[in-house]
Amino acid sequence: MRKPIIAGNWKMNKTPAEAAQLVKDLAPLVADASCDVVVCTPAVNFTAVAEAIKGTNIKLGAQNMHWKESGAYTGELSADMLKACGVEYVVLGHSERRQYFGETDATVNLRTVAAVKAGLTPIVCVGEKKEEREAGYTNALVVYQTLIALTGLTAEQVAKDVVIAYEPVWAIGTGLTATDEQANETIGVIREGIRSVYGDAADEVRIQYGGSMNPKNAKGLMAQPEIDGGLIGGASLKAEDFSKVVGFDK
């Protein structure tokens, strides 16, 4: 049985003081959660959030990392730096990183392998654009993105050390959402793609839905058999909203 995982991606929002207050407000609301709860904050908030979540069931996540251990990479952060700040999860390959900052399937793979090697759990994002879905490329594209990202990992690592997030790009920040059935079907396709290379590891890897999940649609999406959680954007910026997504089964 795969344990659900709900992760909030705060993107470029919240100062350290605001971040600490948000998780303090959130903690009592999700204390009895049946799923893993993660907040992926801007790096400037790591220290404040790590302190605020002590003694709670909330885990700290980052929004990106470099694959090198150190070096002349201005503006980048290494896995060891993240771990030293209390980070346990890291979002990799988000559509906004791909769109605005030149991330490619190849660099997402480098980051994914480096994260696993360092003992971080990557949340690897894959998904299609609107025109790609309309052209019928969705299934081939998401399987390709997933398998490239996982290249170099063992079946055991894929099963236990990686989370996949299916985020249809056309549903990011648009208010549009894949239907429950569309999301479930595509995540099932991703799982079968993983099975084609990694066998039964596909039954253990957790795959989230990441396209405008919110308090209103979380219950229906999470009722789908293939969907193991959500990567939550806007709805993670308010404690009450995020707690309702986390409490999808309440």
What are these regions (language model features)?
Residues 1-250:
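Active-site loop-to-helix "anion-binding N-cap" substructures in soluble metabolic enzymes
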